[in-house]
């Protein structure tokens, strides 16, 4: 797992009490084209967007390897980004949610649907 920003700066948040930036690799790409050049092998781009073409999250089958793209709360994902996505998903409702909340809902859905196998030496 890793997190990334495109055309933006990562700001440490006082609400991030676990210091996520120190535990998960953070990549910053200057633009969307740079991100596209650095997508890991066999990864699917999933746009999270209120769009008529998008599938509802509760019906969505997550691919094994995915990059979830979330746009700005006020403008969403640009059309040229949505066109590059392999799939689009949306949450129910008519209003945009906070990006952090949306990301948490999508990742919770993924964790609930996609089995994770830990190595034999892993201790819980």
Regions found by a protein language model. Name each.
Residues 1-50, 111-112:
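RNA substrate-binding interface of SAM-dependent RNA methyltransferases
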